[in-house]
Amino acid sequence: MTPEKFQMFENRLLKNYKHRLKQAKRLNVTCWRLYDHDLPEFPICVELYEEYIYIAEYNRRHALTDEEHGIWFEETKKIIADMTGVPIDKMFVKLRKRMSHREGQYEKEAVTESKIITVQENGLQFLVNLTDYLDTGLFLDHRVTRQMVQAEAKDTHFLNLFSYTSSF
């Protein structure tokens, strides 16, 4: 990977960070997506949850050796850490790969201690699990849907049977 490619990634990250940080403050949310596979050379999704970062790397074919890939990923994490101020030891990394029949998507992954934190969104609190599963349990791209349900379901009770996380 050339220095120019890393510079492109850093520039994109900075642009996204400035815009989305302002937006997060305006919306009073403590969890938001910083980057979503915007550049083909960086097939990752980067999400901020309070003072933690969740990185999902999309498995793909590439011409990098295992060693080169390791160097690429460490440099990528360093750029993210420098940009956000979140240290690498507060980053949680998952590998997303194509699954036939979605086997394993909802299976517990972690063999380490669970890291579950509380995040804020639209006056609500959600628990997110950064370690145990492929997903955190809170899908950030569904924020508008949650806002709609929050407005429509005011002063009512309902049971969400369509989401294994209960947060959609």
Regions found by a protein language model. Give the residues of each.
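Non-catalytic accessory regions of SAM-dependent methyltransferases
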Residues: 1-54, 58-60
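Cysteine-centered catalytic environments shared across enzyme families
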Residues: 6-29, 66, 70-93
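Non-catalytic substrate-recognition/targeting regions of SAM-dependent transferases
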Residues: 45-47, 71-139, 147
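Short, acidic Gly/Pro/Ser/Thr-rich loop/turn segments
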Residues: 53-54, 62, 126, 135
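Short histidine-centered catalytic/ligand-binding loop motif
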Residues: 56-70
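Conserved alpha-helix/loop element of class I SAM-dependent methyltransferases that forms part
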Residues: 140-156
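Conserved SAM/SAH cofactor-binding pocket of Class I
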Residues: 151-168
